Amino acid sequence: MKRSDVMHAEVAHAAKDKETRSAVDDPITLQIIRHDLVSIPNQIDRNITRTAFSQLINEYKDYAVGIVDPDGNLISQSRGSLLIFAANALGTAVRDGLSLHGADNIAHGDVLISNHAETLGQHLNNVVMYTPVRADRGRGEIVAFFCVLMHWIDVGGIMVGSCTSTSTTEIFQEGIQFRSVKLMHRGVRSDDMFRMIQCNTRFPEMLTGDVEAQIAGCLLGRDMVGQVVGKYGVERFRAAVIAMWDHARRLSRMAVEAAPRGEFSGYAFLDNDGVHMDRTVPVGVRVRLDGKRITVDYADVADQLSGPMNAGRNGGAVAAARIAIKYLFSPEEPLTEGDFDLLDVEIPEGKFLSAHRNAPLGLSGHMIPTTVDTILRAM
């Protein structure tokens, strides 16, 4: 190559870098992208409400819609659905899938599902479905994952509804598990997977309708995020995401710096453990604030219970702490990973909010409100 050609290429590359930096630094463009990313899950949320079959979804709205980055960090989440789900579940499922498959083996058009108890720490009805958003109309790198978590009305187990028993003693009595398995591969449905799902539920027609709504939400959301990436470019997209996180971090930092410093305690109890109606369950929480970080310490909560009123660490201790912090510090702002940058969660393994592998989790959501309230009371 001639020296003049090299110089021309260097000048063109420098001009392109300058243009990219200028676009990335443009606050108006970043705000437009930010509002797109906040709006898309809300639009898919409404679509799911209209298209799902079961009342748990179209009336109770027992689901969540969100976008996470290639590492599973939350970018945005729909406001109309249950906060507990996307507070921790979406990114946790995606990270586990990446560890199993690797990013290169999750292709455009792949749709994966996970309700793995050890990973998510919630009852098996809560199924995360996710699909990659790849740049360059599906041919480029993964820039995000679009996720829809939905409460499946029945996944087998010893009781109708799967999560309604008070007598289960291990997770295997509560239904079927999926650990980031592909429901679709490169846009082609797995008939084997659909048959497996339909043969492990008491309501195959209704559940299939919900799953179809979940798939449609994933694919439409993926395309909408892909359009944003295609319009503004990967660098602008990433810059907008970082700006969202930075904004949330600033709000959290201001709140932590303004809060009184010290260790604060809260105590409550559950009326029973779901099996023994005369046995209360203590919920003791300590919150430490040092002006820089906030630590939620669950050392004083009850040990793992014999029945299904347990949750794993991600679905119990971490989820409850994140919900409490979000409610306390910036409830009016969109939910994003930056909200939790200053949060540490400490809990020994084997508590009822950090249950061991294979523990029953059927009633995993029942103790979360009390736990959140106890954290808020401590603060």
Feature map (PLM): residue ranges:
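Short, basic/aromatic recognition patches
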Residues: 36-60, 98, 102, 113-122
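Gly/Pro-rich active-site capping loops and adjacent beta-alpha segments
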Residues: 141-200, 303-307, 315, 319, ...
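A short, hydrophobic, proline-anchored segment that marks a local hinge/packing element in signaling
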Residues: 126-137, 147, 287
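Accessory "access/gating" subregions that flank catalytic or transport cores
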Residues: 219-303
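Hydrophobic core positions in small helical hairpin nucleic-acid-binding modules
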Residues: 82-89, 105, 120, 197, ...
